[in-house]
Amino acid sequence: MDCREARAVVSGTLQRAVSRVSGDNIISPFRGIRYQAAESRDLSTRIAPPYDVISESLSAELRAGDPHNFVRVELPEAHEADTEEANRYTRAAATLQNWLSRGVLIRDEGASFYILEQEFSLEGRSWRRRGVFALVRLPEKGERYVLSHEGTLAAPKADRLRLLQACQTMTSPILMIAEDSGQQLAGLLGRTHGEPAATAQDSDGVMHRLWARQEADYLGAIREAVGPGPLFIADGHHRFETAVTCRDGMRRMLPQAAPEAAFNYALALIASAGDEALRILPTHRLICGLGKAGVARMKEAMRARFEVEERPLADAGEVQLSSPEPGRHVLGAYCGDARYYVLRAGEELTPAGASAVASLDVSVLHDHLIDPVLATLHRQPKLTYVTDESQAMAAVDRGECGFAFFLRPTRVSEVLAVARAGDRMPGKSTYFYPKAPAGLVISDASAEPI
């Protein structure tokens, strides 16, 4: 038997063992790593957003606010003198180990599912979103119980992989959605008893409350509610693919590792698809560097492909607040000419039988307007993304960008349909809010058992 055959035997044996251990259960409780709560359960100065929404200014603010803020692990600073042996990733790992050795962070003694409640204000009302922190068994090749809706980029994956390999810890969770058609999971997530184990208010004003549940019947009920999946990735595609890559590398190095090794799992925050507090913000498009000719060409194409209605600027936000128009795509546009344009299109752009991804407002905008026009220009305009409509319009008014396009929020049902079909949305099609925090509870990703 050569090396290739031996590896295949080991891989097949491990896959069968994982299946025997887990059965239809794709999630597991775990011994979470958390901040020591002996002094205070308020972790407001210690949690951080996930790495990809931390600006330089916010990073500096978090660092200055608390010497133990988790941003030091989630998004470590680079130094000019960094080398392959000593760099931002090795510093993050050293910080994590230092906090563990000093008791700043502790690992819970018993395995738990951790219930998170996030209370926030949006669209003029208050919301409470609930989810469960759990370990999700990483799929083997060909298994489709974790479904994606978004493509990934090499650079963020390389960054997260180096951090994961250095720390051997999942520092922030992947936000996943369970279809939960019978609302079994949603009902269980609402059963929070007693005072939370930890609370935190983040820089956006979101209040986070965490409960650790260890009762055997409750753990079993959560696993049963999620069952064999599928789970849909809402936020964290790069972290998910990174976890799979890391898992594969660890298996090559440690072919005899147990199926229960922590690297076979990823940390996730799982929410119910039926939770109305599972909000998606619209992500608007700004096109900068068009020039006068490019703006004129975009307006010409806009009128050729869509029904265009001109409105006063006071109506600028109405496209996001209007009721859905069945079978119709509704978009907004602004190019600084004191008018707000409402664009509509229907079956002429997405006929009956069109794929789930082709039927999205964001796909119609890109496929029938932005991408065709940009392809005809000699210059290379820059496409940027914002969630705040007023910021987009201000950028046009300042002359920084030539065109702003406004989208209605993608619906959760659309995300699930695209993922189920195996399609990929255009980049920045979804912005789930609020983000799952980094540092509230993290998980081991080493070869140790979960």
Give short role names for the model-derived ranges.
Residues 2, 10-450:
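Surface-exposed, charge/polar-rich loops and edge strands
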